[in-house]
From Swiss-Prot:
The modification N6-acetyllysine is found at K609. This is Acetyl-coenzyme A synthetase. One of its GO terms (biological process) is acetyl-CoA biosynthetic process from acetate. It is an enzyme of class 6 (ligase). Mg(2+) binds at V537, H539, I542. It comes from the Bacteria. CoA binds at R191, A192, G193, R194, T311, N335, S523, R584. It holds the Pfam family AMP-binding_C. The gene is acs. Acetylated. Deacetylation by the SIR2-homolog deacetylase activates the enzyme. It catalyses: acetate + ATP + CoA = acetyl-CoA + AMP + diphosphate.
Length: 651
């Protein structure tokens, strides 16, 4: 591999940065050698009702996975994000909202947000929601989504935010698994000029007979297109808040009380409800936000992520708001109504820090200079990348074109399960390499291991594991601690396995190489191959399916599905469309297969295991070295698949 040159730290950044290289090295060493002392001090970044005396109580031992931080302390997340800022910055903007339509935008101050959250928290209480109840939030990117989340946290209810792109079946599955009591949605969402039928999707989801505990649906009026309305069950947001008091004292919450559940794709079957608790999560989200973005008071920060993903939780809302930041929430997409929309928003709101995904960057890069036409972007100071590894070409384009070659890029590696950044540059402390996530954050102990779990030293490539706990770590999977241990701690004993592969270079920098398990990364969104395969096989004409990811220059990975039809069924253009729409309905648009490869048989071992390694190589056209196929029950299948692929390419 060609050596990638380092980008030095710009002098303008170094002069005012919160952290330099020497300080980083010193603090990082302390965080490993004496985590109790380090986190005992850093835990004070948030306000505690009852201060903690215990800091770290964790175990990665087989059969005893236990993760507890600040466990005797109490606090309230909503108070940390709102109440504590009222005296100093009550009139400062908390959220800038930019609508899908460029003519729609508004600013909400900390005082106004506090008022709205208290009102809505009282609405929840009036509806019988209490501490420990689960509330599902299926909302578009409007400030009310943030209000709903903060209101849940204020009273100790657990929120389960469901991405607005998910289908009714995906919504009902999450409602059933989490035992949801109340659903909050909108009549419709708006995205790139199109409407998303959120309320209709909720209606369809609640028709599932296994949904038993949802007694009410609160509906925010976004477009005014009402559709079906179930009297008694469905209630308008604006009518409920009109009668609610704006006085709502915070609930005292233990550090280890649940804060939220967020469902993420598993490599085996149904999605996993990742459970985060309150204290450690908020400390970690706050500290990582402050140092990784080198946040300075009064700066405008824009994270383009949806609230339905963990990035929207940690780095659109909770991290920024707990630090008293100005956070921008965008309803639309970066290339609508014009391909320079992202750049226009940067100029319009004088954005100082931009945090977006490689998918968006690659889509804009494909437009060339049109993506920045008529804009200056001179307000930008720091930029970030999230969701998947960023290829060096896209990194350089982002750096030169969007950032005018002056803004450090923090390429952050982390996961839903980690709660916050794990491997990331710090703007004033880390020289950058295009495409590398660089070095671990405080308290994070990464290691690379071979397939037997032996740690590899120096320059190497292997499975990325974390050898000790950190405060933002997920505590469990909702209602299934055994699956939590099985998923993350059984592959390599005594270590958290990320499911990602990585390379370490001569400077100790980490380069994430992508998933090593059966999870796809589509436009920064994780989707389990098993989930897509289940959806395909539920189609009445399909006998078997195997899904793999193949490189895609915009989305990172495309979904390539090998499909075997039932006896007597024949492939056709109509069936091709029908099957793609079927998956779209079962899971959501994000999971729609890009390519269907009709085939009579799949490469299987004698024990019946599908050899995905071969399918991945065929899908991506990497067929020169298919490796050992002697273990296949019928090696002739491979030749047939290659011929089919050739025919598909020609057609």
């Amino acid at each position: 591999m060609t050596k990638i040159m380092k980008h030095p730290i710009p002098i303008a950044i170094a002069e005012h940065a919160l952290m330099n290289e020497q300080q980083y090295q010193q603090d990082y060493q302390l965080s490993l050698q004496d985590p109790d002392r380090f986190w005992g001090e850093k835990g004070k970044i948030v306000d505690w009702i009852k201060p903690y005396t215990k800091v770290k109580n964790t175990s990665f031992d087989p059969g005893h996975i236990n993760i507890r931080w600040f466990e005797d302390g109490t606090l309230n997340l909503s108070a940390n994000c709102l109440d504590r800022h009222l005296k100093e910055r009550g009139e400062q903007t908390a959220i800038i909202w930019e609508g899908d339509d460029p003519t729609e935008s508004k600013a909400i101050t900390y005082r106004e947000l506090h008022h709205d959250v208290c009102q809505f928290a009282n609405v929840l209480k009036n509806m019988g929601i209490k501490k420990g109840d689960v509330v599902a939030i299926y909302m578009p990117m409007v400030p009310e989504a943030a209000v709903a989340m903060l209101a849940c946290a204020r009273i100790g209810a657990i929120h389960s935010v469901i991405f607005a792109g998910f289908s009714p079946d995906a919504v009902s599955g999450r409602i059933i698994d989490s035992n949801t009591k109340l659903v909050i949605t909108a009549d419709e969402g708006l995205r790139a000029g199109r409407t998303i039928p959120l309320k209709k999707n909720v209606d369809d989801a609640l028709n599932n007979a296994a949904v038993v505990n949802v007694s009410n649906v609160i509906v925010f009026k976004r477009t005014g297109n009402i559709g079906h309305w179930q009297s008694g069950r469905d209630l308008w947001w604006h009518e409920l808040v009109a009668d609610a008091s704006a006085d709502c004292p915070v609930e005292e919450i233990n550090a280890e009380d649940p804060l939220f559940i967020l469902y993420t794709s598993g490599s085996t079957g149904k999605p996993k409800g990742v459970l985060h608790t309150t204290g450690g999560y908020l400390v970690y989200a706050s500290l990582t936000f402050k140092y990784v973005f080198d946040y300075q008071p009064g700066e405008v920060y824009w994270c383009t992520a949806d609230v339905g993903w963990v990035t929207g939780h940690s780095y659109l809302l909770y991290g920024p708001l707990s630090c008293g930041a100005i956070t921008l929430m965008f309803e639309g997409v970066p290339n609508y109504p014009a391909v320079n929309r992202l750049s226009q928003i940067i100029d319009k709101h004088q954005v100082n820090i931009l945090y977006t995904a490689p998918t968006a960057i690659r889509a804009l890069m494909a437009e060339g200079d049109k993506a920045i036409e008529g804009t200056k972007r001179t307000s930008l100071r720091i930029m970030g990348s999230v969701g998947e590894p960023i290829n060096p070409e896209a990194w350089e384009w982002y750096y030169q074109k969007i950032g005018n070659s002056k803004c450090p890029i923090v390429d952050t590696w982390w996961q839903t399960e980690t709660g916050g950044f794990m491997i990331t540059p710090l703007p004033g402390a880390t020289e950058l390499k295009a495409g590398s996530a660089t070095l671990p954050f405080f308290g994070v102990q990464p290691a690379l291991v071979d397939n037997l779990g032996e740690q590899l030293e120096g320059v190497c490539e292997g499975n990325l594991v974390i050898t000790d706990s950190w405060p933002g770590q997920a505590r469990s999977l909702f209602g299934d601690h055994d699956r939590f241990e099985q998923t993350y701690f059984s592959t390599f004993k005594g270590m958290y396995f990320s499911g990602d592969g990585a390379r370490r270079d001569e400077d100790g920098y980490y380069w994430i190489t992508g998933r090593v398990d059966d999870v796809l990364n589509i436009s920064g969104h994780r989707l389990g191959t098993a989930e897509i395969e289940s959806a395909l096989v539920s189609h009445p004409k399909i006998a078997e399916a195997a899904v793999v990811g193949t490189p895609h220059n915009i989305k990172g990975q495309a979904i390539y599905a090998y499909v075997t039809l039932n006896h007597g069924e024949e492939p056709s253009p109509e069936l091709y469309t029908e099957v793609r729409n079927w998956v779209r309905k079962e899971i959501g648009p994000i999971a729609t297969p890009d390519i269907l490869h009709w085939t009579d048989s799949l490469p299987k071992t004698r024990s019946g295991k599908i050899m995905r390694r071969i399918l991945r190589k065929i899908a991506s056209g990497d067929t020169n070295n298919l490796g050992d196929i002697s273990t296949l029950a019928d090696p002739g299948v491979v030749e047939k698949l290659l011929e089919e692929k050739q025919t598909m390419s020609i057609s």
